């Protein structure tokens, strides 16, 4: 079992999906829908959990494969997750920080990362609407999506908190929005 969220693909979707080569050149992998879905249909629902609680869960059961959206409340939380992943001695610190910067997202001023990769790539013509409600984030189809189409989120919707931008700058890492 890998502790690294970017290597986990079991993302608990409500519809059938598959990871394939992205339709975007040089983007790597993407997630594709294997059935036609209608606008407004639930694609995914995941619970939000604080990074400290997530680490405690894994310390109790390193094989826990529950998928979460992991919340970072401040600069120190970002350093905490780096230290946790360093303890596995599988990647160096710079590689871990880079991966974190690639997989970070926000909703309603909450900075989070997924415990399993979604493989959603960026498109300004996204087909996923994200909704934050209580302790969950829901992903709905923002339009009808035909079978075998790739799922996209518009990264421009992310409102990155200042502590994340400062963390990236202090670690000489590009934040995800600077790639757009």
Regions found by a protein language model. Give the residues of each.
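Conserved catalytic SET/PR domain of SAM-dependent protein methyltransferases, capturing the structural core
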Residues: 1-180
